[in-house]
Amino acid sequence: MKNYLWCLLLLPMFSIAQDSIRVDISNPHATVYTHLYFLQSDSFDPQKAAKTILGLPEEQAIKKAIKIKQVLDGKGLYVDVNKIPVNPNHKDTIGYSSYFKYVLFPQRMPQIYVEKIGDKWYYSSETISKIENLYKEVYPWYVQKLENLIPVSGHKKILGIELWQFIGFLILLTLGYFIFL
């Protein structure tokens, strides 16, 4: 019995931790899921999310991947990944011809879609080229300026509040104190 107890206690030390979620761009569902999953706060890994974008340097692909998610969030578009096809040979048959593509929101945001290139699915070149304009339509010009001013360390959380929010609150309190002094 004592040996079993030692085995149970020591077994976790020898096991290798693995990512249960990996980058998968084999079908429309996997591509969109990979993109959104790796941009969530609890699983944030923008390098992996950027793998859903083809033909850009990693730094640019990361920025584009983040902006795609921000546009979807800013428009209030919830992506129901369970409705996205898992067929790697999915064809969009809307229109006169069929293409290997999947449009996330055909009526509300037809510019954002994934397409099959080779045997993998990526966000389309049209999506990538139009995302800057879509972002500008959704967010005012000063939002991007503020995002560039706040360093990555400003997004660390303390007691459930991001550091930049805490600093902003302290600045407001200080201003309020001096105004009403």
Task: Name each region found by the language model.
Residues Y4-F14:
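Sec-dependent N-terminal signal peptides
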Residues P12-A17, F178-I179:
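Hydrophobic membrane-targeting alpha-helices
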Residues A17-S41, K145:
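Short, low-complexity N-terminal intrinsically disordered segments enriched in polar/charged residues
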Residues Q18-R22, Y102-Q165:
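Short beta-strand edge/turn micro-motifs at domain boundaries
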Residues F38-K63:
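Short, well-ordered alpha-helical segments enriched in acidic and aromatic residues
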Residues L56-I112:
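Surface-exposed, charged secondary-structure patches
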Residues Q165-L181:
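Hydrophobic alpha-helical transmembrane segments and their immediate juxtamembrane helical boundaries
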